[in-house]
């Protein structure tokens, strides 16, 4: 990472740029009177979305371009380009920064932004957000109408809280459980890790568990999809720290602490009992297939991947519950990871391109666009007004409607509901938003996630070599030498 950043900065110093590049001509924001209506303005938007999501984005782009011509008399063209996946997206943008032809706007994760900041390529948004003509509606104290924890992620890059991104598509992790099994054995939906372990122990006494074992299948009480997320969340829930800033404002790796070690030793204990397993144990990237094959009664995974945890043959009903917490945790102590991306504006020599890049970001995340995006994708609302809207509340109500849009009524005169795990995820997942945490991002913080994942694998699947203490020490040494 250090070698890459050094090369990136050297290349930036050598290159000359034509449009968007890391060295702007000025920090001024164009007044409406300074906008040149005689030229076409092209805004490039890099992202990693698939074909279905690109259709939604293009619909929003078409409306934006029409609106900009009506409002400012400018022919704006937004060119969206999918890089296919997030790793390729990050690498492509990093290379384009070095070459001086970065996009105007991009979909980003926090660790992406921290990398781009090393190249001095990211535009701070504070001046645009507060601008009298182009700024966001609402108040800073209300996160400008965005869900608070989502908005806060845009200002985690320095101690001053400079805003470098705004929320775009968001998800979290939830507990999926086999509702048929829970009903059969009278198990209550777990709220704490103690509850989870109690069900794991009861699971081992069931016919389904024995059948799976007799068939040579790998089993467990609860499956964990993302080992990296689990590493961070356990540390957060046990009251420890994962990353942060030191006294000099420099990024620091902080997971060598008693709380982190207690959390990881608990995990080793429960793994050795056959209660808690990860996708590595199952030999897969995700636990969903094992869950659907009744090798696990519970699994923790992304809300955006809910459909993968629903059996297509209808063999059982998938229940959805909040992420388990430590027993006795207060509301302030509860922790759940927030996932998903933001959008970021890059420094541009052409200040008109930069301005309309910002206006595109603003339009992409306004009420109408955010509502359209939410209703047509599996992602959460990022705005409070979208979450409270009649359209969204109708969508998640699970009430059946007739062709004329009226609710179907049952014999008791009440609306008929049909359980939908995908919509239930929206309700359960977003209800966790007060507990969402965000880890600070800085150059090298992405490597900490990789090391966290490796720690989980070492302490669970290579116990002869790695204790919790050794795994942490080796990880910190690797990060220091990177």
Regions flagged by a language model, labelled:
Residues 1-42, 473-482:
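Short, low-complexity disordered leader/linker segments with a strong preference
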Residues 31, 110-172, 213-215, 234-236, ...:
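Hinge/lid segment of periplasmic solute-binding proteins
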Residues 70-149, 180-191, 288-290, 297-298, ...:
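Extracytoplasmic "Venus flytrap"/periplasmic binding protein-like
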Residues 72-74, 99, 162, 185, ...:
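Extracytoplasmic/periplasmic substrate-recognition and gating elements
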Residues 126-146, 213-214, 220-222, 240-262, ...:
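Short, solvent-exposed loop/beta-turn-alpha elements that line the ligand-binding surface or hinge
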Residues 153-168, 173, 197-252, 268, ...:
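Extracytoplasmic/periplasmic solute-binding protein
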Residues 183, 403-482:
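Conserved C-terminal helix/tail region of periplasmic/extracytoplasmic solute-binding proteins
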Residues 200-201, 248-281, 323:
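Glycine-centered hinge/linker elements that transmit conformational signals in sensory
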């Amino acid at each position: 990472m250090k070698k890459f950043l050094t090369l990136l900065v050297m290349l930036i110093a050598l290159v000359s740029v034509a449009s968007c590049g890391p060295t702007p001509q000025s920090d001024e924001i164009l007044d409406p009177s300074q906008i040149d209506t005689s030229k076409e303005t092209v805004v490039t938007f890099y992202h990693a979305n698939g074909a279905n999501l690109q259709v939604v984005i293009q619909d929003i782009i078409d409306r934006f371009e029409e609106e900009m011509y009506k409002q400012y008399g400018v022919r704006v063209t937004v060119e969206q380009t999918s890089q296919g996946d997030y790793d390729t997206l990050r690498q492509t943008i990093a290379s384009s920064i070095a070459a001086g032809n970065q996009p105007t706007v991009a979909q980003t994760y926090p660790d992406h932004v921290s990398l781009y900041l090393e190249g001095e390529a990211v535009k701070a948004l504070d001046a645009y957000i507060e601008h009298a003509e182009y700024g966001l509606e609402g108040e800073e104290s209300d996160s400008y109408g965005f869900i608070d924890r989502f908005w806060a992620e845009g200002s985690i890059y320095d101690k001053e809280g400079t805003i470098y991104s705004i929320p775009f598509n968001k998800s979290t992790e939830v507990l999926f459980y086999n509702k048929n099994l829970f009903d059969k054995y009278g198990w209550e939906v777990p709220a704490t890790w103690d509850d989870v372990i109690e069900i794991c122990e009861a699971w081992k006494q069931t016919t389904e568990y024995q059948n799976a074992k007799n068939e040579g299948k790998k089993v467990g009480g609860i499956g964990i999809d993302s080992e990296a997320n689990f590493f961070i969340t356990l540390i957060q829930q046990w009251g420890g720290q994962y990353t942060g800033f030191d006294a000099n404002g420099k990024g620091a790796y902080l997971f060598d602490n008693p709380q982190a070690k207690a959390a990881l030793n608990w995990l080793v204990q429960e793994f050795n009992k056959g209660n808690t397993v990860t996708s590595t144990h199952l030999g897969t990237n995700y636990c969903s297939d094992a869950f659907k094959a009744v090798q696990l009664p519970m699994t923790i995974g992304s809300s955006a991947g809910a459909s993968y945890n629903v059996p297509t043959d209808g063999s059982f009903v998938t229940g959805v519950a909040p992420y388990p917490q430590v027993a006795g945790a207060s509301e302030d102590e509860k922790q759940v990871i927030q996932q998903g991306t933001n959008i970021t504006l890059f420094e541009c020599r052409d200040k008109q391109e930069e301005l309309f890049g910002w206006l595109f970001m603003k339009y992409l995340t306004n009420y109408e666009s955010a509502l359209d995006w939410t209703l047509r994708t599996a992602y959460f609302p990022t705005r409070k007004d979208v979450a409270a809207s009649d359209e969204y509340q109708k969508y998640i109500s699970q009430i059946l409607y007739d062709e004329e849009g009226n609710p179907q009524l049952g014999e008791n005169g009440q609306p008929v509901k049909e359980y939908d795990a995908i919509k239930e995820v929206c309700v359960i997942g977003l209800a966790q938003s007060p507990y969402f945490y965000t880890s600070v991002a800085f150059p090298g913080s992405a490597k900490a996630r990789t090391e966290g994942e490796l720690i989980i694998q070492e302490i669970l699947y290579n116990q002869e070599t790695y204790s919790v203490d050794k795994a942490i020490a080796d990880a910190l040494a690797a990060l220091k030498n990177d």
